[in-house]
From Swiss-Prot:
Homology family: Belongs to the IPP transferase family.
Oligomer and partners: Monomer.
Catalyzed chemical reaction(s): adenosine(37) in tRNA + dimethylallyl diphosphate = N(6)-dimethylallyladenosine(37) in tRNA + diphosphate
Binding site for ATP: G10, P11, T12, A13, S14, G15, K16, T17
Swiss-Prot/TrEMBL site (Interaction with substrate tRNA) positions: T101, R123
Keyword Lyase among record annotations: no
Annotated SUPFAM superfamilies: P-loop containing nucleoside triphosphate hydrolases
GO MF entry, a single one: tRNA dimethylallyltransferase activity
Matching Pfam families: IPPT
Classification of source organism: Bacteria, Pseudomonadati, Pseudomonadota, Gammaproteobacteria, Alteromonadales
Gene Ontology biological process terms, A to Z: tRNA modification
Protein name: tRNA dimethylallyltransferase
Top enzyme category: transferase
HAMAP family to which the protein is assigned, alphabetical: IPP_trans
Amino acid sequence: MLPKVLFLMGPTASGKTALALELAENHNCEIISVDSALIYRGMDIGSAKPSIEELARGPHRLIDIRDPSESYSAADFRADALAEIEQIIRMGKTPLLVGGTMMYFKALLEGLSPLPSADDAIRADIQAEADAKGWETLHDQLRDIDPVSAERIHPNDPQRLSRALEVYRISGKSLTELTQTKSAPLPYDVVQFAIAPRERKVLHDLIAQRFRIMLQQGFIGEVTQLKARGDLHLDLPSMRCVGYRQCWQHLDGEFDYDTMVEKAVAATRQLAKRQLTWLRSWPELNWLESGAEGNLVTLMRHCR
C-alpha cells in the first residue's frame, strides 16, 4: 500500500490555511506550503503568510526559503516538496500540501519536462531584441520554430514568450518537443481536495476584505522596506505577486492610493478566477465549501 498524501487546494482567501490548521491539530499531519509567494522572506503581510500564532499551531514547511531577489521554479518546488514528503512519511505522519499555486501541484503530481535552467545572458539578448523590434517580431520567430507554443502563447505575454525562445536557444529543441517527456509521477496515494465558496460574490468580498486588513496591518510599509533595499525591481517573480506590484507602482507615483486598492483587489480576483479555472478541470477532486461545518470530518475520514 502506498503512503497517503493529502492535497488541499483552492483560490486565494478561500479558507485553506484555517482548515489545514484544524486538521493538523486533530490528526497526525504536517503541512507543506504550496504557494509561490510564501517562499519569500520579508513578504509576510501581502502574501497572507501564516502568523506566528498560526505557525505555532501548525508549522509550515517551504515558507521563507528564498530571498525576494532569487528565483524559484516549479522544478525547485518539486524537488523540495518530494524531500519534505519523504521526511514526513518517515516520521509516521501524513503530508498535507496546502496552497493555491496550481502549477506547483501539477508539477508534483504529474512530473516535469527536462527544461534547461534560465540563462541570464540569453534572456538579456531576447529582451534587447524585443526592445528594438517589438514582441510581435519575436512571436513570429517562435511561430517559425515552435508553432504549437506560438498558438498557445500570446504576443502580449512577454514572460512566457521569452521563456519559449530561451529554451530553444539554449537546447536547440522547441518547448513543445521538450515538454513531451516528463519525469516520474508522484509515487504516493494522493487524495485531492479543493475548497472554495459556492458563490463567486462571496469570494470577491473575502478578497476585498482581506486586502483592507493587509493595509491595516502595514502592507504599504512592508513594500516600502522591500523597495528601499535597492536590489529589487518589478521584473522579479517576487515583485510580480499580486498586491506587491500594485503597491510598488503606487509608491512610484504611477497612481493614487484608491486606484492602488482597486487594482490590487482586481488583480487578486483575476488570480482567484485563474485558480478556479485550473481546479474545474482537475481530475479526481473532492470539493469542499468554504466555512462548511463538515469539512474537517471529511478530511479526517480520508486521512485514515
